Design a protein with these regions (language model features):
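A short, N-terminal "cap"/entry segment at the start of jelly-roll beta-barrel domains
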Residues: 1-32, 116-131
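Histidine-centered metal-chelating micro-motifs
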Residues: 45-47, 65, 81, 85-90
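Short acidic-glycine-tyrosine-enriched beta hairpin
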Residues: 70-85
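A cytosolic small-molecule/anion-sensing beta-strand core signal
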Residues: 60-61, 76-77, 95
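Anionic, Ser/Thr-rich low-complexity intrinsically disordered regions
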Residues: 66-68, 100, 108-116
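Conserved short histidine dyad/triad with adjacent acidic residue
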Residues: 36-50
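Glycine- and acidic-residue-biased ligand/ion/polar-headgroup-sensing regions
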Residues: 53-64, 69
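Ligand-binding loop in jelly-roll beta-barrel domains
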Residues: 85-109
Length: 131
């Protein structure tokens, strides 16, 4: 499937235990963008990493200590942060919390293998509405 359904219902959408006190739920995606809900247990760590995707993170609840390219800030409900492609970033959550991550392009590693195999790149480049 090259995109998610138009509507996503939290009580019907799979929540994946990704280990280390983290759980992830896909909210929606296509070939351009992806939104994911992530639960952090108290004390959970999202270890520093980099990726080619732009990322915006919105804090739904809890307190997160975000480090982006060596700068650490404390973010709480209603706060957000932006990570440019290849920015070194990570977060700890001393309270437990929930955040929404948005990626562009989507994180292929969060999807089943082959999710975008049927995308016609030439068609995408000429008219993205046709994909």
């Amino acid at each position: 499937m090259s995109k998610s359904e138009n509507f996503s219902f939290g009580n019907e959408t799979e929540v994946e235990d990704i280990g280390g006190g983290l759980k992830r739920q896909m909210l929606g995606y296509n070939h351009e963008i992806m939104a994911v809900k992530i639960w952090f247990e108290k004390g959970a760590i999202g270890y520093n990493h980099t990726h080619r995707h732009s990322q915006v993170t919105y804090i739904v609840e809890g307190e997160f200590h975000f480090n982006i390219d060596g700068v650490t800030k404390i973010l709480k409900a209603g706060d957000s942060c932006f990570m440019a492609p290849y920015a070194d970033h990570g977060a700890t959550c001393p309270t437990g919390g929930i955040l929404i991550d948005t990626f562009s392009p989507p994180r292929e590693d969060f999807l089943p293998a082959g999710a975008f195999d049927n995308i016609d790149i030439e068609k995408l480049n000429s008219d993205p509405k046709k994909v």
